Amino acid sequence: MPALSSFEVLAESLLPKGVTPLTNVPFVLQAYFVQVSYPNTPKAAPIQFDLTFEETTNFNQGVGQPGLLAQFLDEKGLANNYAGFFTAGKPNGFLAQQIAPGQTKIYSVTVLPPSGAARAAAPIPQAGTGWRGIASLNPKTANLLIATPTQRQIYFSADMQTITGSVVYAVPTVSGKTVI
């Protein structure tokens, strides 16, 4: 599978482990998004593809796999949860996806912040969940899709009641190109 880019998703306190907080310490959620577009070309047919995620760290920090939210925005702009992201015996990711000419879909993975008992079980220093690895996009027909990966971060107050900031930045692709 052609590697697209590295990825990192996390939900954690910004306080390094072992440091005693003197004030409220912000909490960050970081998500990974891939916008997949198929330019409208004459006589083009829909394309199937897989967007897979190979971990380079075991996804067991914090709440682990149950804390992951996988979604995609379809061609109508509607958000859809994707329940089959972690399926035993198959690659992790969005499998058997289809896109038609002239469409754009946006895929995202993020970690939900711990709540209730899960938050109490995760110690505040570096509390939360993190997952890192390599994302790959494997279309059935090459060189027709445009893929743009981004990281998005949302910063919350320590009690997670207020958003204090956010940022979006492009993630370099392995090839340096966006045509896949």
Residue ranges and their predicted role:
Residues N24, Q30-N58:
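Asparagine-centered strand-capping/turn motif at beta-strand->loop junctions
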Residues E12-S13, V28, T52-N58, L112-A117, ...:
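Short regulatory "switch" loops immediately downstream of catalytic or recognition motifs
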Residues T57-P125:
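Intrinsically disordered, low-complexity Pro/Gly/Ser/Thr-rich segments with frequent PxxP/GP/PP motifs
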